[in-house]
Design a protein with these regions (language model features):
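Metal-ion/cofactor- or nucleotide/acyl-coenzyme-handling active-site neighborhoods
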Residues: 1-274
Length: 274
């Protein structure tokens, strides 16, 4: 059934069910889902210890990340561009699925750059990107864990199929919760792009291994404003769901970034918790 006919004839819940079924079928047919059972070894491994999830937004320049050198730190994607990255030597490196819109060459460039620049003890990748990692023999002798994500309800159990991630910090948060970290501190996750219509990092975006076709040379979106706000709303809802889950489980998630839009978490200053 073509999408526009499907959406016109069927209620939203049934449409979502159809899309979820299609995505799960593809996930099982194209990937060895048994690989995610390895993640069971991570369950509550760091129970009661604190961690920091550090994003690549411009606000991360406001703090001295070397103050976290003796902490458990998650970074994501291209954080290796930070001038203090090697000295910080973060323990965890999280990567969501590379966009289907990317070519194989772009995916290879992205992953190769991470392989070259990052030597973290733990790497997390979407299982749908395993084929290219295997094909080009990337991350040899490195400790990889795969996440299986689809269009389903979030499980907060990375040894099972869980909900897909709209942004990298969502994956890092679910991993940290699964590993038993408490409290979990956030910084450098601004998520204010829809408000200011600028997609900036702490580094020059021209350094990115692959360019987002929806972002122009001035780091502004080519999409219409209503589309940006709709996407942002869906992303905020995902963070709100995590906040509710964490509150019910007595897990403290603290946002240390006053410039961030993540107001669903308690706010503190970075200097307060050192």
């Amino acid at each position: 059934m073509r999408p526009f006919i499907q959406n016109w004839l069927l209620p939203p819940k049934i449409c979502n069910g159809i899309e979820s079924g299609k995505d799960l079928t593809y996930l099982y047919l194209k990937n060895d889902i048994s690989l995610i059972k390895k993640n069971q070894t991570l369950k509550d491994r760091y129970c009661g210890k604190r961690c920091f999830i550090i994003g690549s937004a411009p606000s991360i320049k406001d703090i001295d990340i070397l103050k976290l050198k003796k902490e458990h730190v998650f970074v994501m994607s291209t954080f290796y561009y930070h001038h203090q990255f090697n000295e910080l030597s973060p323990e965890f490196h999280s990567n969501v699925k590379i966009s289907d819109a990317s070519t194989e060459s772009e995916k290879l460039d992205w992953l190769s750059a991470i392989d070259k620049n990052v030597n973290s003890p733990y790497f997390f990748f979407d299982i749908k990107d395993k084929w290219i990692i295997d094909k080009y023999e990337l991350f040899r002798n490195k400790n990889l864990y795969y996440i299986a994500a689809s269009i389903i309800k979030r499980k907060f159990d990375i040894s099972k199929i869980t909900r897909f991630y709209r942004t990298n910090p969502l994956q890092a948060l679910e991993i940290a919760i699964y590993m038993g970290f408490n409290p979990i501190y956030l910084h450098g996750i601004d998520l204010n792009e829809a408000c200011i219509n600028e997609y900036k990092h702490f580094f020059n975006s021209k350094l990115l291994p692959a360019k987002d076709p929806d972002i122009d040379q001035n780091d502004r979106s080519k999409r219409i404003q209503s589309t940006l706000f709709n996407a942002a709303s869906l992303t905020y809802k995902e963070f709100e769901d995590i906040a509710i889950y964490a509150n019910n489980k007595n897990i403290d998630i603290v946002n240390l970034n006053p410039k961030s839009m993540l107001q669903m978490f308690q706010i503190k200053n970075f200097t307060e918790i050192l």
